[in-house]
Amino acid sequence: MKKIAIDAMGGDHAPKAIVEGVNQAIEAFSDIEIQLYGDQSRIESYLVKSDRVSIVHTDEKINSDDEPAKAIRRKKNASMVLAARAVKDGRADAVLSAGNTGALLAAGLFIIGRIKGVDRPGLLSTLPTVDGSGFDMLDLGANAENTAEHLHQYAILGSFYAKHVRGIAKPRIGLLNNGTEATKGDSLRKEVYKLLASDSSLQFIGNVEARDLMSGVADVVVADGFTGNAVLKSIEGTAMSIMGQLKSAIAVGGVKAKLGALLLKGSLYDLKDTLDYSSAGGAVLFGLKAPLVKSHGSSDAKAIFHTIKQVRTMLETDVVGQLVEEFSKESDAND
């Protein structure tokens, strides 16, 4: 049985969206147990009772405006902290939260801990492509500054995730840059390019540009945390703008626009599904000793369900256990 600790109080729509997503997951998957951390009475008002769901009550939670490291240290009974502690103590196999991103990353690093040999765990998410296959990208903001060695390690981590979680036999690795030529980019990008090109264990396809990401140019895209986060926000904003413009055009376009929308209803839903990255799950802080997944702060029940599904897949494939083994081999080889 796979045990998942969930911060029920994190996110814009907590605990309602969190608990409703849990209800869906419990019905869909018979091999998971959920531990919900938070206000018991509020959780119970939305929970469909199940012997595979338990509640650990706490009145304390980490707010969106709390300073991450301080919150983790001072709010020792916060729902997020207790969920992470359950993983560290072996009472749960993975942790999920839609709460304060910085605090969750801090909880992952300080409570769960990183895998030996991993210098900087990276925030990884599967983002949409026009063909629906998606691509994995990291780092999406766990680290504001990176070295070339960090990005080389992100390529290894991303390739490992794509193989074991998404089932891609030979993931194509691309380095996000301002041009596709090998000579493009600043000194960091040029150094990373050399490291990736010389690593025979990776299927490195070279530099990729931001404009080509959603066309599926690569299965894994590597970036420093600052750049990766900026690209993530751009993709999110573009998707929301496109859907907003379509809705507005239909609403004010009169009868012809509404008839056209009716005829294109199926295609419009397909477009919405393509741009909706929530169905791929949340962002993984990959490189920790256990799966830690951050769901978007605005997640609804559907997004929480898909994030639980993602965590279940990570546990089913034992991707973290295999990653520990892989890095221990590298560590032994370097000793």
From Swiss-Prot:
Keywords: Cytoplasm, Lipid biosynthesis, Lipid metabolism, Phospholipid biosynthesis, Phospholipid metabolism, Transferase. Its main location: cytoplasm. It is an enzyme of class 2 (transferase). Disulfide bonds: none annotated. It is found in: Cytoplasm. Its EC number is 2.3.1.274. It comes from the Bacteria. Pfam families: FA_synthesis. GO terms for molecular function: phosphate:acyl-[acyl carrier protein] acyltransferase activity. It catalyses: a fatty acyl-[ACP] + phosphate = an acyl phosphate + holo-[ACP]. Pathway: Lipid metabolism; phospholipid metabolism. One of its GO terms (biological process) is fatty acid biosynthetic process. GO terms for cellular component: cytoplasm. NCBIfam families: plsX. PANTHER family: FATTY ACID/PHOSPHOLIPID SYNTHESIS PROTEIN PLSX, PHOSPHATE ACYLTRANSFERASE. Catalyzes the reversible formation of acyl-phosphate (acyl-PO(4)) from acyl-[acyl-carrier-protein] (acyl-ACP). This enzyme utilizes acyl-ACP as fatty acyl donor, but not acyl-CoA. Belongs to the PlsX family. HAMAP family: PlsX (MF_00019). Homodimer. Probably interacts with PlsY. This is Phosphate acyltransferase. It comes from Streptococcus equi subsp. zooepidemicus (strain H70). The lineage of its organism: Bacteria, Bacillati, Bacillota, Bacilli, Lactobacillales.
